[in-house]
A protein has these predicted regions:
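C-terminal cap of thioredoxin/glutaredoxin-like
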Residues: 1-23, 147-225
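Ser/Thr/Pro/Gly-rich low-complexity linker/stalk segments immediately outside membranes or between
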Residues: 25-42
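Short, flexible loop segments at the rims of nucleotide/cofactor-binding pockets, characterized by
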Residues: 39-40, 70, 167-168
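A short beta-strand-turn-helix
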Residues: 42-59, 83-84
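Conserved strand-loop elements at the edges of beta-sheets that form or border functional pockets
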Residues: 54, 63, 205
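Catalytic His-Asp charge-relay segment
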Residues: 60-62, 189-190
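Structural alpha/beta surface segment adjacent to cysteine/selenocysteine redox centers
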Residues: 62-67, 73-150, 182-185
Length: 225
């Protein structure tokens, strides 16, 4: 039995080493592709949160979203376009794959997460956009993984790491757990934060631009109690 255990342990170690190698980005390929993806936009270094818009914006809208949620799918382009028109507001993504949409929802969340790790902030948001464009929603998923322009050589790595990379898996699980701790169990849900006052407000569903502006005005005008 001891010899068998040693053999099995050795096989497992080799498998983990191969997986780790597969999930490591190719530095030379990344450098060659630097100017082929999002040439006209600025890449933002990943620091634990994916943020769309100005990093210096006073207000942050944290969107708790599921990539298989049909309501999130419809709302995402509207919210993104609204942020484009309001430079003092940025958008932060928070993964919340719902149990009813598993296992596809978590896989897609990991896929977008790893795409962002591979090539940065802009590619993460592009991955989210592509998934929403292609998914049949409600757990049905996409007909094949999205293809990100300029990342063809890394596609296999992204697909594999979305399935098996433990760090990416933990990121998605941790964000979903944090949402549950905060009492957020439905998507989409927004939490708007004011960096100046430190206050925040939660909005459930898909509020339109007028509601978003009203919430921001309330945060900006509320006095200390």
């Amino acid at each position: 039995p001891g010899a068998v255990h040693q053999i099995l342990y050795g096989i497992g170690a080799v498998a983990l080493a191969i997986l780790a190698f597969e999930c490591l980005p190719d530095v030379r390929q990344a450098m060659q592709m630097l100017n082929t993806v999002s040439q006209t936009s600025k890449q933002t270094k990943h620091n634990g949160a994916w943020v769309y818009g100005s990093s210096s914006a006073r207000f942050t809208i944290v969107e708790y979203a599921d990539l298989e949620c049909p309501y999130c799918k419809d709302y995402f382009p509207q919210l993104k376009a609204w942020v484009d028109q309001h430079p003092d507001v940025n958008l932060q993504w928070h993964h919340l794959p719902l149990p009813m949409h598993e296992p596809v929802a978590s896989y897609e969340a990991r896929w977008a997460e790893w795409a962002g790790i591979e090539r940065g902030n802009d590619v993460f948001w592009l991955a989210v956009e592509l998934i929403y464009q292609r998914t049949r929603s409600n757990g049905a998923g996409t007909a094949g993984n999205p293809q990100i322009p300029g990342l063809e050589d890394r596609q296999h790595s992204i697909d594999n790491c979305a399935s098996s990379n433990p760090a990416v898996r933990q990121t998605v699980v941790s964000q979903a757990h944090k949402a549950s701790q905060d009492g957020i169990t439905a998507t989409p849900t927004l939490v708007i934060k004011d960096k100046v006052s430190g206050r925040s407000i939660k909005l459930q569903g898909a509020p339109d631009g007028d509601v978003l502006l009203s919430a921001i005005d309330w945060l900006a005008s509320t006095k200390d109690l």
